[in-house]
A protein has these predicted regions:
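Acidic, metal-coordinating catalytic segment for phosphate/diphosphate chemistry
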Residues: 1-18, 88
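Short, well-ordered beta-strand micro-motif
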Residues: 21, 97-101, 117-120
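A cytosolic small-molecule/anion-sensing beta-strand core signal
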Residues: 23, 31
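A conserved beta-turn-beta hairpin within the catalytic core of GNAT-like acetyltransferases
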Residues: 36-41
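Active-site-adjacent beta-strand/loop module that shapes the phosphate/pyrophosphate-binding cleft
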Residues: 81-106
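Nudix hydrolase/Nudix homology domain
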Residues: 106-158
Length: 158
């Protein structure tokens, strides 16, 4: 029996994963091609599949959305994303965001991402044309700080 997950107005929270990928002083972002957040820039990530580990799930989502192969380094943050509509919960995700390093692949938008790009810190940390959700900025900043604290070799940075 196949069970379809109801993403809109779910009965229970859904579990997702996200990736903060820092390379050469930039962070990788995707523009969402589907709801929620359609048309908005965010971190690569998505829904965890049944039976899948968190680490495998984040690597799979990054590969599906960006074409890149990554290795998760460590958990950055575990958070709730709740979108309400008319006094109801339209979306509720619990998301585990990981600091990841690129280990292969070729960058290209795929799956539910309609664009991908490397973004300089000044772009995501300011009021530029790139509008990011405050929670996303907080997660990126946490990942950026952790990446800076690690040896650059550990993240594959040049």
């Amino acid at each position: 029996m196949t069970h379809t997950v109801q993403r809109e107005f779910p009965e229970t929270p859904l579990f997702g994963v996200g990736a903060v990928i820092v390379e050469s002083g930039r962070v990788l972002l995707v523009r969402r091609g589907q709801q929620p957040l359609k048309g908005k820039w965010s971190l690569p990530g998505g829904m965890l599949e049944l039976g899948e580990s968190l680490l495998f799930g984040v690597a799979r989502e990054v590969r599906e959305e960006t074409g890149l192969e990554v290795e998760p380094i460590e958990l950055i943050e575990l958070l709730d994303r709740v979108h309400r509509e008319d006094n109801r919960v339209r979306y509720h995700y619990v998301i585990a965001d990981y600091l990841c390093r690129v280990v292969g692949g070729s960058l290209q938008a795929a799956s539910d991402a309609d664009a991908v790009r490397w973004v300089e810190r000044a772009e995501w940390n300011s009021h530029s044309a790139l509008i990011l959700d405050p929670i996303t900025v907080r997660v990126i900043e946490s990942g950026w700080q952790r990446a800076s604290a690690l040896n650059s070799k550990d993240l594959g940075n040049k």
